[in-house]
Structures are given as C-alpha cells and as structure tokens.
Amino acid sequence: MAAEREAGRLLCTSSSRRCCPPPPLLLLLPLLLLLGRPASGAAATKSGSPPQSAGASVRTFTPFYFLVEPVDTLSVRGSSVILNCSAYSEPSPNIEWKKDGTFLNLESDDRRQLLPDGSLFISNVVHSKHNKPDEGFYQCVATVDNLGTIVSRTAKLTVAGLPRFTSQPEPSSVYVGNSAILNCEVNADLVPFVRWEQNRQPLLLDDRIVKLPSGTLVISNATEGDGGLYRCIVESGGPPKFSDEAELKVLQDPEEIVDLVFLMRPSSMMKVTGQSAVLPCVVSGLPAPVVRWMKNEEVLDTESSGRLVLLAGGCLEISDVTEDDAGTYFCIADNGNKTVEAQAELTVQVPPGFLKQPANIYAHESMDIVFECEVTGKPTPTVKWVKNGDVVIPSDYFKIVKEHNLQVLGLVKSDEGFYQCIAENDVGNAQAGAQLIILEHDVAIPTLPPTSLTSATTDHLAPATTGPLPSAPRDVVASLVSTRFIKLTWRTPASDPHGDNLTYSVFYTKEGVARERVENTSQPGEMQVTIQNLMPATVYIFKVMAQNKHGSGESSAPLRVETQPEVQLPGPAPNIRAYATSPTSITVTWETPLSGNGEIQNYKLYYMEKGTDKEQDIDVSSHSYTINGLKKYTEYSFRVVAYNKHGPGVSTQDVAVRTLSDVPSAAPQNLSLEVRNSKSIVIHWQPPSSTTQNGQITGYKIRYRKASRKSDVTETLVTGTQLSQLIEGLDRGTEYNFRVAALTVNGTGPATDWLSAETFESDLDETRVPEVPSSLHVRPLVTSIVVSWTPPENQNIVVRGYAIGYGIGSPHAQTIKVDYKQRYYTIENLDPSSHYVITLKAFNNVGEGIPLYESAVTRPHTDTSEVDLFVINAPYTPVPDPTPMMPPVGVQASILSHDTIRITWADNSLPKHQKITDSRYYTVRWKTNIPANTKYKNANATTLSYLVTGLKPNTLYEFSVMVTKGRRSSTWSMTAHGATFELVPTSPPKDVTVVSKEGKPRTIIVNWQPPSEANGKITGYIIYYSTDVNAEIHDWVIEPVVGNRLTHQIQELTLDTPYYFKIQARNSKGMGPMSEAVQFRTPKADSSDKMPNDQALGSAGKGSRLPDLGSDYKPPMSGSNSPHGSPTSPLDSNMLLVIIVSVGVITIVVVVVIAVFCTRRTTSHQKKKRAACKSVNGSHKYKGNCKDVKPPDLWIHHERLELKPIDKSPDPNPVMTDTPIPRNSQDITPVDNSMDSNIHQRRNSYRGHESEDSMSTLAGRRGMRPKMMMPFDSQPPQPVISAHPIHSLDNPHHHFHSSSLASPARSHLYHPSSPWPIGTSMSLSDRANSTESVRNTPSTDTMPASSSQTCCTDHQDPEGATSSSYLASSQEEDSGQSLPTAHVRPSHPLKSFAVPAIPPPGPPLYDPALPSTPLLSQQALNHHIHSVKTASIGTLGRSRPPMPVVVPSAPEVQETTRMLEDSESSYEPDELTKEMAHLEGLMKDLNAITTA
C-alpha cells in the first residue's frame, strides 16, 4: 500500500510542472506497483512475521549541489544585470528564481529571462523614487522531481540612485612639495562611478595623486603642474553629474617653518574580510613631514609587506583584510620640528562560514535523527533550516538543539528530502545541505550509524536471521504517570518466559498524530522504560515490541495513557516594553496575559544589570513600574512573571534597555606629565573607570597654567579616543599646572587634581643615558634607612628620575623610582640589625645610567635614638616617649553588601574641616567573634574612611581605628559593629541520607544537615525526587520543608523502585545549590505488612487497593496460564474453603454457648454477691466466694449523680490492675483500610507539612522509645490507683474504638453503640495530639476477640448483662489540675467521675523485646490473677486523650448490645436506692484513702 500511495503521488497534473515525472518514469509505474507489494513485509515484521525482503537494495545518496551561487551586485538604472546560478544533479535540475521570497514568473516577463545555465538576466534595470521593481534579494531554487529541492544563498541587487553631492571641492593652495586634498563626497552607492578632471581634462591617477574610496582626491609632493581647475564627475548610466570647479594654487617654498596640520585625520571604519581598507592621513607642513603608521604599539612595515601600502599623502591601504587586521591604528607625522599623531579603529566583520556541515543520513521510520551544523562569523550568525526549499518551523517534532542543530523526532516517510542549514549575519549568508533517506524496516542501514542517530534508535538496525520471533509482551502498564514523563513496565512474552536475551522497543505517538516515535531499552532483559519530554494533559498511545536475534516480534495491544495536567498558571504578559526616563531610571510596561487561568493577583518584575548574574525582583500590582536608583548609562534586562492563585506563570522574553547618559562622575585616571624639552610637556592619562563614564566619552578638556597664582588658564580639547597630548610653546624653566576632565554629550565631568611639571632651562641631551649621581649618603635607623643624593655633575643630559634599589646583601630585591627633582628618600619597613645594600641610578627615556652603591646596617630594637636627617644629637642621648594621640571618634560601620562594609570616623586632632595636611595615617582593624579565637585583620588608610572587603555574608564584625603620626600613635577607638547582608547559600545541604520507615515500605525518611555555607538564616528546604536522575529538574517532584526541620517523610512511593533525591536550601536572598543526587530503592512488598498504605495482597478487602508488587511480580495463574506450567487443583481449593467455613462456625457456636452459660450463672448469685462484697457491677470477673473479693478500686457505676467524699476504705487488701499483652503482630487485627485512608487524608490536610509521625522540635531530635503496657500492683497497706490517659505515637498495635472517645464538648462519658473491648498500650512520649487518637480508631468489624483468658462473671447486672471496662477523658477539665485522675467506664448509664490519686510505688519490670509488655511487681506475678482492670498511666497535670484497654474475654457484638439494652431497662427504684447507698460509702472510703 505504501508503494501504491507513492505511485499515486507521482500521478500529478501537467499544470504542476515541478512535481510531474518525466515520461519514461510513467512507463515504470506498473513495475513500481509490483515491486512495492513486498514493502508491506516491513509492517508485517512488526506483527511477528519474518522479513519478506531482507535482500532489498539500498538507495544511494544523490549528488545535488550548486556549482555557482548568486552574489551581491551593484547596478545603475537602465543597465543590464546577470545573477549567476548553476546546480549539478543527475538528472539535471529545474532552476527557478525567487525575489524577496516569492517565485518569479519568468515566462511572462519581458525584462527578466532564465539563461540555459540557470542564471537570471535582467535587461534595462528599472529604478525610480516610487518604483523599484528590480532592487531586492534574489535566491536561486533548484528542484529534481521525486528527489528534492535546494536553495542558494541570498544575493542583494542594489540599484544606485540619483547622484547627490554632500561635499564639493573648494579653492585651496599648496606649497611646492607639500600635500593637498580636494573633497568630493557623493552617496555611497555611486562612489565607484566618480572620476576627476583637471582643467576639463580627465585626471590621470598615479602614486602621487590618488582617489580615496570616499571620492576625495589627494595630491602629495605638489608641483607647479598640479595647479588648475578641478571638478569631480559622477557617471551612473544617465547623464553625467558635475560638481563645482575649484582652483588649486601651487605656491613657492616660503623657506620658513610651517606648523604641521592635519588636512584629513584617519576615521574609524568597518570592513568585511577580503575587502580593501584605506585609512586616510594627510598632513601638511614645512619641512614636509614623514608619515609612519603603528598598530598596537608596533610600527607597521609598509615597504616589504605586500598587503600594507603607503599611498599619497601618508594614507594606509590594507588589501585583502583579515580578522587579524582589526585594531587601533596610529598615524604619526614628524618633520623634525614637530610631531603630530592621530588614531582610528578598524573593525573587521566576517561573513558566515561552516565549521561543520550537515551530513547525509540513512534512517528508519519512527527513529530520531539530528542534523549537525556548526557555524562561525562576526557578528555571530543566526541559523535557520530549510527542507526541500521550505523553512522548517520548530515544533514538537522539529527542534533546534545546541543552538544550531536540527533534531527530527519520530521520522515518517514524508520527512525524506534535502535539508539545508542557512547561516546569516549583517555582512552575508551561506548555506550547506544534506540528504535524508528513510529505508524500509526490513532494509538494514548499510553503514555504521552516524553520530546524528540517537542512541535509543539504533538497536534494531542489524539484519535479522531466520528463526522464531517473540510474541507480544504481556501486561503493559503505566506504573508512573507524571506531567511530562511516563514509566512503562511489562512482562516477558509468553513465547519466552525468561526473556533474558530480549530487547524491547516502545513505540508511542500522540493521539491524533500519525508521527510515531520509538524508545529502546538500554540493556537486554530490561522490562521498563521511562518516556521523557511529554506534554502535560495529553493522551499518548504506547505499543511494546520484543526483539531477539531473529528480528522483531509481535506488538502489544495499544495502551492509552494521559499525562497529568499541570497547574493552570498564567501565560506570559504580552507587549512588554522598557524605556529609559533618566540616567538612573527605567520604566517598564506590559499588558495582562492572554491566558491568565484565573484572576491575576500580582506581577513580579525581574531586572538584572548586563554582565552580572545577580537578578533582582520587585512585586508590582499594576501594568507598569518605574525603577529608580539604577546606574547611569548601563544596560539592564527586564522580564515579567504573572502570578495567580496557583503560583508564578510563564516569564516574558527579556527586553534590554540602557539608561540615559550623563556627565562623567569621576575624573580621568593616572594623569602623568613628561617634560619633553624646554618648551613642551606631554600629558598622559587614562579614561575614567567604565562605571563612572556615564556615557560615550567624546573628548577630554585639558586646562593648564603657570604655577603662579594669577596666571591665565589655557584650555585644549582633544577627541575621546586620544589619551595623550603634547603641549607646546611653553616658557623655559617654568613650572606649569595641568588638569584633565572627560566630556560626554551631556557635558564635562570633574577634573583631576592639578599636577605640576617644570620645563627644562635649556634643551638637554637625551640621546644617551645619564651619568652617575655625584654623591650618595645613607642614614640607618631601626626599621628604615634615609637615602640622600646629589644629581650627576653633567647637567646637559636629561634626567627624568632616579631608581633606588635595596635589599639584604643585594640591591636587586626591591626597586623604587622617584622624580628627578627629589634629593632624598626614606626606605621603610626594614628589618632591624640587618645589612642592606643600596644602589642609586639616574634614568631618562634612553635608559638607566651607571649605578652608585652604598651599604648600611639598621639599628637594633634596643636603640630608640631615631635621629632626624638634619638634626645631629649625641649618639646615646635618651629620647623621651612621645605623647600619645587622641583616638578617632564617631566610628561608624555602613553595610554596603554581603562582603563589604565602609568604616568612617572623625579625628578631633584635625581642624574643623577635617582636612589631613600632614603625614598621619590610620589603622583599621576588624574581626568577628565566631569562632572565638579569630585574629584581627588590619589595614592602613590616609583618609577618614576605609572600605573593608572580602567579608563573610551574614556575619557580625567589630571595628576599631587607631591614628599614627610619626612615632606617635593613639589607642584603639571604641568599637563599631556591623553585620554583612545575607547571600544566597553557596553550598548545598550536607549529609543527605534516605532510609525506609520501619513497617511502612511506601514511606521513606529523608535526613540532612544544614549547608556549611548558609550565608544567612535558612528559611526552608526543597526536596526534589524522581525516578530518573537525568530528568530535567522541572520534571522532578518537589516537597517543601520549613527551615527548622532537618528530616521529612515522603509517603505513597512505588515499591521496588529506585528514587533519586536532591535537597536545596533557601534563605531570604534566594535558593542555594542542590545537593548531589542520593539514590534509594524502595523495598519490595511483604505479605506480613499490615500497614494501611502497604497491604499484602491477601488482606485487600472492600475499599482497599491492591499493592504495587513491582515490575517483577508474577501472579499465580491456574491451568495452562500459569507461568511455570503448574496448575492448581480445584479439589485443594474447595477443601480449603470447607475447612475455613467449618472453623468459623464452630468458633461462633462455642462463643455463644460460653456467653449464655456465664450469663445464667451470674444471674443466680447477683444479689448475694452484691450484698456481701460491697462491689459495684463492673468489668472485673471474680471466681470464688466472698472472701476472694478485692476491696473497691474506684471502678464503680452511678446514675446521673456526682461523687461525694468517703470517710474510709472498707477493705485494706491491695488491688492489682493488669492488661493483656499481644505477643506478635498477628494477635491484633489491623484497622480497616478504607477508614484509615480517609482519616489519613484528613490528617494530612490538618497538619500541613508534618508527617504522621513527626514530632516537636525537641522530641524529633531524640530517639523513640518502645511502647509499654503498665498494670497496677499496689504495695502499701493502703493502695491507691493512679490512672491518667496518655497518648501513644502511632504504634501499629494500638487500636481505638471509634465510639469509645469522649466528646470534646462534654465532661461526662456516654455509652458506646458497640461496647467492644479495646486493646491498647502505653507510650513514654510526652507528646499528645487528639488527632492521633481519631486517626487510629478502627472499625467495629475488625476488633479482636481475645482468647488468652476466659472466665465466668461473678458480678452481673440484674438481667445478667456482661460488661466491659472503658476509659475516656474529658477535654474540658481544669487546666490547672495537678493530680492524675482515674476515669471509670460503667456498664450501665451512670456518670463517670475523677478522684485524685497518688501513683503507686515500686519499680516496674520492662522487657524491650516485646511490642508491648506489662509491668508487674514480683508479688503480682506470683499471685493468681482473679480480676482484670483497665487504667492509663500518664504525667501529672496534663490532659491526654483516652487510651482504652483490651479486656481478655468479650462476647459478640450483637449479644453484647442486647445485654446492654437489657441492663439499662432492668434497674428498679429500690435497686437504685441501694446503689446510691453503696456510692456514698465508697466516697467515704475514698476520703479516708486520700487523707491517710
């Protein structure tokens, strides 16, 4: 069918000449149809059949390229133009032309015609002001039918306009032997058509007379024959255009010096590689100057270099410009009396070129390929891709990767053709192409897969051999579905149950899209694949195919999976604009996003200075904002993000804008003066720093004057690129002051300080080095040596300064240069008692002179007589200690950034204006107190402020200042403190560990430590986790955690799955780096797990879900479907069912018989026992007569009456309370899954980020203690039961009845609807949370019936109803209560009460090996247990939720409910009176116990 569709596509109409095949090809169509049928065998290969055409031939790549491409052309109106183009292919291609992107209809065009070689011929070019049909961009298009199309580079045809003179020649004069210029500037297109005439005769050009590219005429070494009338003529196809005539007069040599003057300065220009550049430089003057050129401080050789030629007048011509020719060129003219110089910048641009061209590619359908294209050029070229002549628009399947490469995903047959990479910049464009051939699936790729094939798509390219093919993979499921990735798992095919040597290919496509993609497993036997880079909320169709050495097998049934939707976030804000409003402010405007996905709450405006990586943000509620306080003339980038209730949306594109320029805010730098001779001084300087220029420097203003106060100031302006100036015409032996200021278009900035220099008395000789200084004297002190000298005796040689060298034993260790006027210098910071060698040399521009040597030994520390150079004291005269100076005051620390603090202070010893006029200096010291042993750091300053840098972020420092003047120093000032600003964390959280939670394989616990370089208070953490470590970070799942926590639980993970975890810390400044990925594999499912979130398969009941048993789990199957071929016998299954039902029926019958027997026996002795034992009917079960009955233990019943005090206790015998112990996890039935799931959801919504077992900050840092169950065994003669409820921390053995909890709004207990016994245990934790009790409440149908102890009840209600003890607590108890309470749960409707009690003495016994263990005294262990009571132990003064206790024996639910109803209706008035009497007696006993 594919061949038939291909043949049908060839049958096109004759009107479409681009797609019609030649007649011989039409004759082959029947043959193509026959040959095309086996092509369906490729499709059959996917369905499990062996290949049908393995030996099919492979098509070869077709040579198809341009021999000649059009180039940019300049033409004039009315002329003819040929745009060359020629392409090679077999068969010959069809050539067409495009103009400005539209095909030209050459058949009906009279002026344009296609030449046989493919070139375009345009006759009689038309061009006018309003009609320019021929000017534009032309492109040649070559097409080979049934093969493809390629396009040439784009060529620009420019038609010159009407000639217009912007400047014309003017009358001038020139001395014989000098130079002259005559201007003639026209529009740039017509410069090649300019010629000159002298006296109406064509002017012949030679080495002495040249025409510059601008049209200007330069005449050098003028002669008398050069005089006359000159005019320039423009001939551009129409009538010639003449300029004005100008007369050039040639004057005789005046025999006097004429100052050098620039007739034409060099100007900066831009050229393209391969072109010629002419840098003009014409200087006139007498004597005639000699012009030389320099580049980057190197003299250019214009004599022997073939590319560098010096033209007439001194102009420099550079032929065949290369990128290395770019730079700054200096033109220097010198005539022996004067030197002038000028400079210009040459910028070289490079057309696009290819470092790596696309390569031809073979591929199969559904594969992914990449065409590589690496380009170069200046400016950096942009790249676009063209397929068969049409521009490729990036989409989901055509993507631009690595800036220039084209990636095609999920190839289809129609993707075949020619692909071209087109690179373009301001100075040109270029193209390079490659061919893509898509082979049938049964045709192997003939060569090794090139690097442009993705690694996941080349595994099935080897030719298949004969043999059985695998069947379809089984049980293909999506085990993990996210917004942008899906994880698929499957089982081996039935034909190969082991499948160790099978590889798998996953074919997938977006629903409704025919383009299919493929992803292969990474190794044989692997049965899972994660498909990345999917679209959110999109349906994808997946099919899995197994492959063995014989080929591809059957495909699995299509699996339809929809990715998760992303949160509905706002789209980008449209029409963002930014414009500068002042040198320090920029206004940004935007509009409401088109897809806001709800109400936009606010916007966040991000901006960043260009060249930095620190982005700042501002919250904005409107659609515009003006940012102030920006740097002047600085480029900033801006972007806007809209926020709705879901969070931040899509960011806009960055827009860049520069603040307006301003006058410079700082003076030029490094001002220096060089005295050339007796009448000139050269000034050198550097521009202000880039941050203070505030705009483009357009020039410099030089002001100078004589040192005398009343002298006039002279100003000189120079260009912005000039950094030195020669000032001439000065007086001999006179001191001058100079200062320089920078200029922008906005004005003049601040000037430098005045700098002085004195001209020489006479013009001295500087053709040789100075002579040796006439004398050298040294004066050693303790840590310094004073050096003095006299100048050389020969005063006729220029001395520009002195070089002092010194060192211990050698004078070459250090060198200091001083001014030529200086006669002494103090070398400081020397070592005491050390031998120093000192040398002194005079120097000038030629070099250094002969050195003069001297040596000296510094004085020891004990010698304090540091004598001034000009004051002679006795060598041993003691010098008194100097008076200390006053310390600086008002020390302040101003925080500037995270690592910089400015220290300022005042000096009371200075005048009021605080101006330093002497040699004092200040020492600043600083340190931080963390750690405590930190040493001080010091720095010296000569001003009243100092900038301390290199500090640590978010750190408190203390600063103090000391002043020193000569030998006098002050004490340290009072300290000032300053804390640096915070900075984003610069290190990730450390010690990241992941462990599985015990008993909950779906829950893991992540632990970590704070970053070592937090740089501020950590406000939170973000935990990232994913099953793919290579996934993009935005595809990872995130879990936010508050900053004071160092552990977090993650629940509901997939079993037996590797997860990768990363953690990122944040503070107020932003997010820090991520930690390295930590891998953790969740455990496999365990059938003994009874956790609500990880049940075994056999315990999944109604409302529960099956667990994830991992990708390797194979469920048992019956009969022939069993993977191992071992069928299960139906007889065994039926027998097992009969046994289970029989055991259940027998158990129920036994329980009912025992309950009836106990009820009847209790009824016959009820009244007698009550009168004899004075005991209320309760949950205690007694065996024996009255003498065995224990005294009252306050577990009593009453009816709507409050307790009254008791005077005494009727029986001093001790009472013990015991609690049964479940010995293993099977003794307690787990809670119902559906109930736990619901409660779990409510808990999560209530607790926020805390997990179900999270503890308080203090409790969470210490280990958990095992839970305990504690009975009471009273030892003293007057026993007291101390009972108080305490909350347990999520023990899996704790189960609470939903109806056994007291309502928070009531202070009385009420009857449960189903009074079942409840098992509990005690925890030593001090945390209480009522929500935990609710969370652990099971349903009534899952409560166990204990079989550990069974007895008959001796004390019953009048109707014989058996009751159980329950324990509850009121949440309205007085918060100031300081004693524990024993809460009583009656079996008939009487109110509960609380009595103060004292905890029992005696240490308990504790066995940590059991899940929950009773604490019994030795006496209680030896005593036969007659009764079981329930109680909870807790901490004094705290209110805890109730913890019910399991009673060993319990009736069925229905029977117990009936007994309770009978019990409630069996009370008569006389019995109530008797009961009240008992109650009053017990109150008296209670008073006696508590007061004893």
Curated annotation (Swiss-Prot):
Q: Name one GO biological process term.
A: regulation of axon regeneration
The family database entries (PROSITE patterns) matched by this protein are listed as: FN3, IG_LIKE
Q: Which cysteines are joined by disulfide bonds?
A: C85-C140, C184-C232, C281-C331, C373-C421
One cellular component term (GO) for this entry is:
cell surface
Polar residues: bias regions: 1118-1128, 1222-1237, 1321-1353, 1361-1380
Q: Name all Ig-like C2-type domain ranges.
A: 63-158, 163-249, 254-347, 352-437
Pfam families registered for this protein in UniProt: fn3 (PF00041), I-set (PF07679), Ig_2 (PF13895), Neogenin_C (PF06583)
Kindly indicate whether the keyword Transcription regulation belongs to this entry: no
**Which of UniProt's keywords are assigned here?**
Cell adhesion, Cell membrane, Disulfide bond, Glycoprotein, Immunoglobulin domain, Membrane, Phosphoprotein, Repeat, Signal, Transmembrane, Transmembrane helix
Provide the membrane topology annotation. Single-pass type I membrane protein
Record PTM Phosphoserine, positions in chain: S1209, S1225, S1432, S1463, S1465, S1466
Biased-composition ranges, Basic and acidic residues, are 1083-1092
Cytoplasmic compartment ranges equal 1158-1492
InterPro entries (UniProt xref): FN3_dom (IPR003961), FN3_sf (IPR036116), Ig-like_dom (IPR007110), Ig-like_dom_sf (IPR036179), Ig-like_fold (IPR013783), Ig_I-set (IPR013098), Ig_sub (IPR003599), Ig_sub2 (IPR003598)
Database matches in CDD domains: FN3, Ig, IgI_1_Neogenin_like, IgI_4_Neogenin_like
Glycan attachment points: N84, N221, N337, N501, N520, N670, N746, N940
Major location category of this protein? membrane
| Bilayer-spanning residue ranges | 1137-1157
Expressing tissues = Widely expressed.
Name the family: Belongs to the immunoglobulin superfamily. DCC family.
Q: What does the record's free text say on domains?
A: The Fibronectin repeats 5 and 6 mediate interaction with RGM family molecules.
Relate the protein's function as given in its record.
Answer: Multi-functional cell surface receptor regulating cell adhesion in many diverse developmental processes, including neural tube and mammary gland formation, myogenesis and angiogenesis. Receptor for members of the BMP, netrin, and repulsive guidance molecule (RGM) families. Netrin-Neogenin interactions result in a chemoattractive axon guidance response and cell-cell adhesion, the interaction between NEO1/Neogenin and RGMa and RGMb induces a chemorepulsive response.
Q: How does it assemble?
A: Interacts with BMP2, BMP4, BMP6, and BMP7. Interacts with RGMA and RGMB. Interacts with MYO10.
Q: What is this protein called?
A: Neogenin
